[in-house]
């Protein structure tokens, strides 16, 4: 069950089994964290590997700087993207699907429903990124396909299943950096098409979502050609 609490000016979401990660958040707010490695550090996004009393964790801080008005209106109409991702992750893992990395804590600093800053504590998976593997054999391709199919069956999508978003640990496939968007038929079809593009895993499901996606791409390319731009 998801628990919601307030720490200073932050609204905090945790799973009832992961309330210990509130201690990690408090350490971060007190500037008392041990940073092992910085993965990303740009104006609006900081992603780092930290060492804690509960092992290594991923800490992500995101403060959106662009399209603020657009994000505000989207949050009013559709709700919050990361809250939805947190809820989906808890639901799917509670249903027994553990291929996706766990999302332990989400903290938000917001006005009304618009979030100015997100703080996320996420499971660190100590394995080999798929992008560091020169060869992907058929057995591994099958595991990748099965992991995405299982994700779809539980109502989630990857959104971007490239090699950097899969980690192999003890011979098993783990998925990271998932999408919090609704698992529509078109988004599932995009995942399958991307698997074929990245890994040569043939898409054998040509449902309505697939044909709508193909049609939209053809229309976008048609409009680009009318404007004198190359097709994508």
From Swiss-Prot:
<keyword id="KW-0547">Nucleotide-binding</keyword>
<keyword id="KW-0418">Kinase</keyword>
<dbReference type="InterPro" id="IPR009330">
    <property type="entry name" value="LipoPS_heptP_kinase"/>
</dbReference>
<keyword id="KW-0067">ATP-binding</keyword>
<dbReference type="GO" id="GO:0005886">
    <property type="term" value="C:plasma membrane"/>
</dbReference>
<keyword id="KW-0448">Lipopolysaccharide biosynthesis</keyword>
<dbReference type="GO" id="GO:0016301">
    <property type="term" value="F:kinase activity"/>
</dbReference>
<dbReference type="InterPro" id="IPR011009">
    <property type="entry name" value="Kinase-like_dom_sf"/>
</dbReference>
<keyword id="KW-0808">Transferase</keyword>
<protein>
    <recommendedName>
        <fullName>Lipopolysaccharide core heptose(II) kinase WaaY</fullName>
        <ecNumber>2.7.1.-</ecNumber>
    </recommendedName>
</protein>
<dbReference type="GO" id="GO:0046835">
    <property type="term" value="P:carbohydrate phosphorylation"/>
</dbReference>
<comment type="similarity">
    <text>Belongs to the protein kinase superfamily. RfaY/WaaY family.</text>
</comment>
<dbReference type="GO" id="GO:0009244">
    <property type="term" value="P:lipopolysaccharide core region biosynthetic process"/>
</dbReference>
<dbReference type="Pfam" id="PF06176">
    <property type="entry name" value="WaaY"/>
</dbReference>
<comment type="function">
    <text>Kinase involved in the biosynthesis of the core oligosaccharide region of lipopolysaccharide (LPS). Catalyzes the phosphorylation of the second heptose unit (HepII) of the inner core.</text>
</comment>
<comment type="pathway">
    <text>Bacterial outer membrane biogenesis; LPS core biosynthesis.</text>
</comment>
<dbReference type="GO" id="GO:0005524">
    <property type="term" value="F:ATP binding"/>
</dbReference>
């Amino acid at each position: 069950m998801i628990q919601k609490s307030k720490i200073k000016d932050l609204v905090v979401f945790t799973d009832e089994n992961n309330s210990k990660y509130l201690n990690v958040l408090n350490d971060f707010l007190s500037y008392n964290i041990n940073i092992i490695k910085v993965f990303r550090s740009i104006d609006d996004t900081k992603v780092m590997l930290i060492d804690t009393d509960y092992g290594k964790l991923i800490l992500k801080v995101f403060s959106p700087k662009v399209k603020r008005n657009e994000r505000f209106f989207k949050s009013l109409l559709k709700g919050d993207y990361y809250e939805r991702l947190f809820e989906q992750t808890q639901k799917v893992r509670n249903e027994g699907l553990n291929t996706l990395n766990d999302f332990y804590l989400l903290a938000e600093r917001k006005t009304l429903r618009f979030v100015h800053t997100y703080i996320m504590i996420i499971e660190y998976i100590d394995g080999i990124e798929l992008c560091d593997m020169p060869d992907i054999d058929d057995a591994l391709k099958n595991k990748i396909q099965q992991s995405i199919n299982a994700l779809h069956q539980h109502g989630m999508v990857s959104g971007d299943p490239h090699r950097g978003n899969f980690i192999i640990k003890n011979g098993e496939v783990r998925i990271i950096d998932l999408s919090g968007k609704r698992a529509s038929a078109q988004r599932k079809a995009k995942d399958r098409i991307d698997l074929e593009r990245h890994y040569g895993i043939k898409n054998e499901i040509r449902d309505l979502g697939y044909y709508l996606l193909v049609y939209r791409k053809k229309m976008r390319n048609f409009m680009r050609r009318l404007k004198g731009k190359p097709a994508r």
